UniProtKB/Swiss-Prot annotation:
PROSITE patterns: ALANINE_RACEMASE (PS00395). GO terms for cellular component: cytosol. HAMAP family: Ala_racemase. Belongs to the alanine racemase family. Its cofactor is pyridoxal 5'-phosphate. It catalyses: L-alanine = D-alanine. CDD domains: PLPDE_III_AR_proteobact. The lineage of its organism: Eukaryota, Fungi, Dikarya, Ascomycota, Taphrinomycotina. This is Putative alanine racemase 2. NCBIfam families: alr (TIGR00492). It comes from the Eukaryota. Its EC number is 5.1.1.1. The modification N6-(pyridoxal phosphate)lysine is found at residue 38. GO terms for molecular function: alanine racemase activity; pyridoxal phosphate binding.
Amino acid sequence: MRGARAVIDLRAIGYNYNLIRELLDEKNPDAHILCILKANAYGHGAVEVAQFLAKYCSAEGFGVASIEEALELRLSGIQNRILLLEGFFTDEDELSLIDKYNFSITIHCEEQLKSFMNYPFKKPVEVHLKLDSGMNRLGFTPAEYADKYRLLKNHKNVSGIVKATHFAFADIPEKSEYTLKQWRIFEKAAGCLPDPLSAGGGVIVVGWLNTIHMDWLRTGSMLYGLDPYDLDAKAPELPKPLIPAMKLMSTIVCVKHVEKDQPIGYGGAYVTTRDSLIGVVAIGYGDGFPQVRNGCPVIINGKRVPTVGKVCMDMLAIDVTDVPDVKRGDDVVLWGNPELTIEEVSTFSNENPFEIITGLTRRVPLQYTF
């Protein structure tokens, strides 16, 4: 078997969930957490993560991007609330599935609103009514929001309304004024209306709970131990560190002696500066590993060593000259140790950590520890 695999620590996800819950309880103990599982739970396996959170953390609900993601969870036995974060894309087919499987939906535009109100649902649906408070992506304007709310409030298709928005700069403390501006817009447009408030993302629990009161908090990256802040941000520290849930690993497929001044890999993007031992690792961009620059660290036999040359589709090369007794079959950690985070790896590429971790392909099997 090829050595590439992603090891998912479900206990770490549980720890991160409980940390978010603990932070919420300090300021807003009545708030609920909506766990975001879109993009296969940020590459961690949506079904397995949902089953774990439902069973061991009593998670109240999950958010996904599409009807396909929602069906995967429901058909695996998940009975918790499942919210379609973008609502529905087509009308008849999706609305019938929403009705059949009791999904909650987001409504963010006039076309969705009309289709929803005209559909003959057998049972009413929970609606998250989206306000565009300054993200300028999805949602009704502040001027029209109250009217849309009133249309839905007593409609036969609606079991309940959650008022929702999304903050554009919550992960960048230097942009705190814009986040406050969005909150004031949201509060003015929706705060006077009954029903709960909802916002994303989870980083709100770090620095905003004294200012922003939410009944539902949508959180994704923090569940998986990813740094919720922009990499360049001067961010406050969490009272306890998050634990990364994924360790990406593979194995050495061969070790080669390469003389000084020899090119490594396609295009000779690296040339040896000494007589070297080069390890070839069974992972590449076909697995979703990013095209990192020379010098990106990996860990082998407990030591950090650099990548050399371009990442190929199925392989990459590392310089193991200074690591004794490296041999075929030795494990290599690409990210996930406390000493090597995906955030550090991302600084050697043109992708951010979320792009990288959700980009792993089906060639990388997920293995779970608990």
